[in-house]
Amino acid sequence: MSPATTQRATVQTSSGRYIDLLDPKPADILIEDIAHALSNIARFNGHTHQFYSVAQHCVLCSGINPDKLALEKLLHDATEAYVGDMVTPIKNLFPGYRTMEDKIAGVIAQAFGLNRGFHHDPEVKRSDLIMLLVEKHALLQANPEDQIEWARIYQDFERLGFDRQLPLDQIGCEPLIPWQPVQAKQAFLDRFGQLYSASWCKK
């Protein structure tokens, strides 16, 4: 295949740099790019009452049980800065997407000194599921079929080894007020600065 017809898998980030999604490097990863992109990407494919960003979701996730893996919780969706926020039902239809997502997550882990597979840690997943419940309750239109979804989420908690009883009144996320993108970006960067500095102090 000639160079002219070779399929490219590069994306350009807000900093102007190009990243090869098939061969990303730790040096390609900038926290500013991640914060900018996630602050402009909508959760739930944009079906919330108001715009609600992945960046805000991540910041709030990092505040749940913050003594455990807070930096990992903040960065658990960082891959979406490069491949977008594909909703879970669609991800399940395309195994290749998860493979690419995991590869990029591994590079992000290298860039910030995290364990490979950090985004799959049960504690990180638990915080993500708690935020999912809070967000669905606060930001999505109620539907009689919600009970089916709640049951599925509770089953996920049990599969991860956690109790079904969730401390929703203790996580500091209600009422959930969506932030503007510029506010979400700054909050993400501030939280990263706090957590990344703390992580290096422990090493």
Feature annotation, model-predicted:
Residues 1-203:
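Metal-dependent phosphohydrolase cores
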